[in-house]
Amino acid sequence: MSAPTGQPAYVLHSRAYRENSALVDFLTPQGRLRAVLRSAKGKAGSLARPFVPLEVEFRGRGELKNVGRMESAGVATWMTGEALFSGMYLNELLIRLLPAEDPHPAVFEHYAATLLALALGRPLEPLLRSFEWRLLDDLGYGFAMDADINGEPLAIDGMYRLQVDAGLERVYLLQPGLFQGAELLAMSEADWSVPGALSAAKRLMRQALAVHLGGRPLVSRELFRKP
């Protein structure tokens, strides 16, 4: 049997576990992994924090792994203010939505790229909307953004509502929570210069995420509301 090899990872969340250990949720190309980190107050424990690129060797076949080795694999992504809150939001989304040990290498790569963009001070809203959409799509919850549930191209002057896990349905009577065709088409092209496109994208992603998050609110969203 070959010895375990290290793999790239980021810490999503860590909490104290028993005496000197920590229970850590990692994001890896092989999915979300939970592992026990021994001697969490030592050198390894100082690395077990979010936004630090790591190389981690996991041991064990069960759902709860053990960290055999953990090393830094690069410079930590330094963020403050709303960029930091945004990173925490990404972590919470992944913990809540990503199944354990379900490989999603594209999610891992997009997460790392999004952290870098946040640290560089790129506009937050487009980054968050892109991450939300690509996460939903990679998990199989995506839907067409340029056609309705009947396969018809979206009309610029049309009004649509989201049928979760089905797609966009055209409606002809005004009602709360509708989206304009022009906004949706702008979203499909990531053209945020169209008036109202970013705010509509935020509403759309909230609706799309809500059913998969269940009834529990995201704690990290409250950080944006605090003065």
Curated annotation (Swiss-Prot):
The keyword DNA repair applies. SUPFAM superfamilies: ArfGap/RecO-like zinc finger (SSF57863), Nucleic acid-binding proteins (SSF50249). The keyword Nucleus does not apply. GO terms for biological process: DNA recombination; double-strand break repair. InterPro entries: ARFGAP/RecO (IPR037278), DNA_rep/recomb_RecO_N (IPR022572), NA-bd_OB-fold (IPR012340), RecO (IPR003717), RecO_C (IPR042242). Keywords: DNA damage, DNA recombination, DNA repair. Belongs to the RecO family. This is DNA repair protein RecO. It comes from Pseudomonas savastanoi pv. phaseolicola (strain 1448A / Race 6) (Pseudomonas syringae pv. phaseolicola (strain 1448A / Race 6)).
